[in-house]
């Protein structure tokens, strides 16, 4: 293999924030955050969906509320529309 062109492959702790589940997987993702896990320090990445929380794997339906783009825009800039009227 050519030296210097491949990303670092290392163990990373992923945190599924939906069900508060942590797991260690090898990954090339980069992050500045770290976490102490089983006596070792690992890079730390949060995720919203994994096999622990996805309805296909759990067999349970779960409503994941994500604010829509229009609602987000209205929340951020709606005050300006009210002031101009």
Curated annotation (Swiss-Prot):
InterPro entries: Ribosomal_bL28/bL31-like_sf, Ribosomal_bL31, Ribosomal_bL31_B, Ribosomal_bL31_sf. GO terms for molecular function: structural constituent of ribosome. One of its GO terms (cellular component) is ribosome. Keywords: Ribonucleoprotein, Ribosomal protein. The keyword Ribonucleoprotein applies. It holds the Pfam family Ribosomal_L31. Gene3D superfamilies: Ribosomal protein L31 (4.10.830.30). GO terms for biological process: translation. PROSITE patterns: RIBOSOMAL_L31 (PS01143). It comes from the Bacteria. Induction: May be induced under zinc-limiting conditions; in that case may be repressed by the zinc uptake regulation protein zur. Part of the 50S ribosomal subunit. Belongs to the bacterial ribosomal protein bL31 family. Type B subfamily. This is Large ribosomal subunit protein bL31B.
